[in-house]
């Protein structure tokens, strides 16, 4: 999902992630209409069907790698032995099983992001939501993380990646472009229409003292 500032990305991400409901229309996830669910029902859907990867990793400093990956399974009520087994399997997928007893502070930025990917995978989600997952990484480490996400996609996982960077967006198979809360393109990532042009980026730059990414246009965007 390619976006520029104020495009409606935050609203769309919140709806896709079952953190908010659309003001109009419906949203179906895995054949289930989640657009009218209450908070508890949406929380259950999040635990069962969604995995989240954030720009800043969001690992708990006092927990080791294995405990961080187990956390969503703990919230889902999975028993201890199964939690450990599934968390270790997820760490194996991202190549960090040997770091399971390390604290986050003992890992590089790229390794911490891979731990967050393992945490997202532990619940066997239907969809993985990655919000600017390379934003806090250097270019080489960012490429490694993107490589992991592409690998997961080839293995059958659905990955929705939010980015403002054309060089990242074009690595996807499909791009959805947002502008002013509306989808203006949905299709092949290699189509010229899929790319955000420089003049559009300039138009979307906020003026000094202007609005942040959560602009009124974004707040009012529907599904």
Predicted features, each with a name:
Residues 1-172, 178:
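ABC family nucleotide-binding domain
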Residues 95, 196-197, 215:
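N-terminal non-cleavable signal-anchor helices
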Residues 182-209:
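Conserved beta-strand-loop-alpha-helix hinge in the C-terminal portion
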Residues 208, 212-217:
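Short linear motifs in low-complexity or flexible loops
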Residues 220-223:
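Short, intrinsically disordered, low-complexity terminal/loop segments
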């Amino acid at each position: 999902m390619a976006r520029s500032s104020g495009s409606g990305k935050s609203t769309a991400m919140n709806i896709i992630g079952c953190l908010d409901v659309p003001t109009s229309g419906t949203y179906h996830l895995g054949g289930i209409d989640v657009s009218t669910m209450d908070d508890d029902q949406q929380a259950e859907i999040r635990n069962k069907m969604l995995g989240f990867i954030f720009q800043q990793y969001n690992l708990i400093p006092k927990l080791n790698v294995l405990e961080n990956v187990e956390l969503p399974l703990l919230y889902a009520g999975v028993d201890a032995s199964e939690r450990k087994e599934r968390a270790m399997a997820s760490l194996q997928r991202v190549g960090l099983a040997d770091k399971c007893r390390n604290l986050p502070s003992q890992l590089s930025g790229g390794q911490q992001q891979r731990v967050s990917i393992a945490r997202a995978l532990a619940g066997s989600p239907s969809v993985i939501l990655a919000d600017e997952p390379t934003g806090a990484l250097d270019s080489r480490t960012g490429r490694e993380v993107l490589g992991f996400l592409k690998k997961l996609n080839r293995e059958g996982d659905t990955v929705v990646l939010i980015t403002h960077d054309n060089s990242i967006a074009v690595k996807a198979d499909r791009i959805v472009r947002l502008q002013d809360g509306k989808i203006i393109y949905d299709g092949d990532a290699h189509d010229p229409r899929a790319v955000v042009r420089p003049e559009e980026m300039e138009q979307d730059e906020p003026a000094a003292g202007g609005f942040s990414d959560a602009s009124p246009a974004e707040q009012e965007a529907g599904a």
